[in-house]
Amino acid sequence: MKLTTHHLRAGAALLLAGVLLAGCDQSSSDEKHIKVGVINGAEQDVAEVAKKVAKEKYGLDVELVGFSGSLLPNDATNNGELDANVFQHRPFLEQDNQTHGYKLVAVGNTFVFPMAGYSKKIKTVAQIKEGATVAIPNDPTNLGRALLLLQKEKLITLKEGKGLLPTALDITDNPRHLQIMELEGAQLPRVLDDPKVDVAIISTTYIEQTGLSPVNDSVFIEDKNSPYVNILVAREDNKNAENVKEFLQSYQSPEVAKAAETIFNGGAVPGW
C-alpha cells in the first residue's frame, strides 16, 4: 500500500507521543517558560544559543524539542504541545496551513538558508550530462523552490504563472532530458553517494550534516534575496504572548547571528 503524507504524519506522531506529551499534555502557560520545536542538528545548535540569550536577557526558560524532519513540528504547535517552532520558511507554512487547516502564523524572521545543488561527480552546471538524474525535495514548497532554482540555471523552463509552487508537471522545456527524482528532504544528503544520482538539490538545514558549505561546495546556489526566509511560528492565540516575543528577540540577536555564521559555514543570512 502506498504511504501518504497523512499516514506518515500519523505514524510518526504515535512514535513521538511519549517525547512530546511526557509529563505535560499542553504547551507551557508560564510566561517565563516556552517550549519550541526545532530540527535536530545545526538548527538546534543555533536555537541553543538563542536559549542561552533568552535566559540571560529575559530570565526566560526555553525548552527545545528536537525533530528529525519537517512533518511534525506544525502538528505539535497547532495542537498546543509546543508554544512555537522555528524550522520553516513562509511558503512552507502557508502550504501546511492550507493543507491541514492549521491556525499558525509567522511572528518574525530568522535566517535565509540558501538552497543549492550539490554533487560528488561534477563541479559546474556545464558538466551536467544529457539524461542526468537530479534529486529534489518532495514537499510542495521545497519541490517548487528546487524547480525554480533549476530554471534559474537554465536547465529547465517552467509554465508561467505558477508562482512559488510549480511541480514537475509544469516543466515545459527540459533540453538535457533531466530525470527528476523526488525524495524527503532529510534523505537527500545520502543520495550524494548514490551512483545513479548526479546532482541533489538540498537545503542548508540538511546539507550541514555532510560538512559541505553552501557557498564553497555547491555546483549552483540560490541568490541571497530569496523569498524563502525562515520564520518563528506560533498559533493565532499565542502570537502576542510575552514568552514568544522574548524568544523572537533572543533569536534575532547578534549572538545568534554570529553563531549561525559559524555553524552553517557562512550559509545562514540574517533575515531581520
Curated annotation (Swiss-Prot):
It is found in: Cell inner membrane. It comes from the Bacteria. A lipid is attached at C24 (S-diacylglycerol cysteine). It is a lipid-anchor. The keyword NAD does not apply. One of its GO terms (cellular component) is plasma membrane. Gene3D superfamilies: Periplasmic binding protein-like II (3.40.190.10). Keywords: Cell inner membrane, Cell membrane, Lipoprotein, Membrane, Palmitate, Signal. InterPro entries: Lipoprotein_NlpA (IPR004872). NCBIfam families: MetQ/NlpA family lipoprotein, PRK09861.1, PRK11063.1. PANTHER family: D-METHIONINE-BINDING LIPOPROTEIN METQ (PTHR30429), D-METHIONINE-BINDING LIPOPROTEIN METQ-RELATED (PTHR30429:SF1). Belongs to the NlpA lipoprotein family. This is Lipoprotein 28. It comes from Escherichia coli O157:H7. The lineage of its organism: Bacteria, Pseudomonadati, Pseudomonadota, Gammaproteobacteria, Enterobacterales. The gene is nlpA.
